[in-house]
């Protein structure tokens, strides 16, 4: 409720809740709970549902059922999806259902210490950080899959110039 109050104070009339919650929004019961709580606020609260069951990146949720119960789109926000075939299948289903997918784009195998972009500041403090390539490789994959499938996708929190150019 505090998020909705802050949104209303900032002039927002509609927000979309992300699905990376505990429990995750990977089933109708949780989705309906989020939407019911949203109805108690002064703004229009929508909710995304998860792309995969338990946000584990292994099995797609029942996207058709979740959309029928009010999911505005799908995401495993905060968790990058590593399986390209699964992402393609999710995109094909999203096209069929006419819903957007939103992706957290960073390849964890390329990151030594997350939380800061790798660059002069991170190197100065010996932190390491996330190289731009960790973001770029998943953005490239998902942009290409979206072009091939026709899916509507959102790339969350872009920080790499190369990623911006790919999205454009």
Feature locations, PLM:
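Metal-associated gating/positioning segment near the N- to mid-region
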Residues: 1-38
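Gly-rich Lys/Arg/Thr-decorated short loops/hinges at beta-loop-alpha junctions or inter-strand turns
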Residues: 12-17, 43-46, 118-127
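Hydrophobic residues in well-ordered beta-strands that form the structural core
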Residues: 16-17, 47, 103, 155
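Short histidine/acidic/glycine/proline-rich micro-motifs that form metal-
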Residues: 20-24, 51-53, 80-81
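Acidic (Asp/Glu)-rich catalytic clusters
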Residues: 34-40, 63-68
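A glycine-rich helix N-cap at a beta->alpha junction
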Residues: 36-51
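Conserved phosphate-binding/catalytic loop of the ribokinase/pfkB sugar-kinase fold
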Residues: 54-58
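Histidine/acidic residue-rich metal-binding segments in metalloenzymes
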Residues: 59-168
């Amino acid at each position: 409720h505090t998020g909705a109050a802050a949104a209303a104070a900032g002039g927002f009339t509609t927000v979309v809740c992300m699905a990376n919650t505990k429990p995750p929004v990977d089933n109708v019961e949780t989705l309906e709970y989020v939407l019911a709580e949203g109805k108690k606020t002064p703004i229009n609260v929508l909710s995304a549902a998860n792309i995969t069951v338990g946000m584990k990146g292994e099995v797609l949720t029942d996207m058709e059922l979740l959309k029928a119960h009010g999911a505005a789109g799908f995401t495993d926000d905060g968790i990058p999806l590593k399986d390209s075939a699964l992402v393609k299948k999710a995109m094909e289903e999203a096209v069929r259902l006419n819903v957007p997918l939103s992706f957290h784009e960073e390849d964890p195998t390329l990151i030594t210490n997350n939380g800061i972009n790798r660059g002069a500041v991170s190197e100065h403090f010996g932190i390491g950080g996330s190289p731009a390539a960790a973001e770029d490789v998943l953005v490239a994959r998902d942009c290409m899959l979206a072009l091939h499938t026709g899916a509507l996708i959102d790339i969350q929190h872009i920080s790499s110039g190369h990623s911006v150019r790919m999205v454009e």
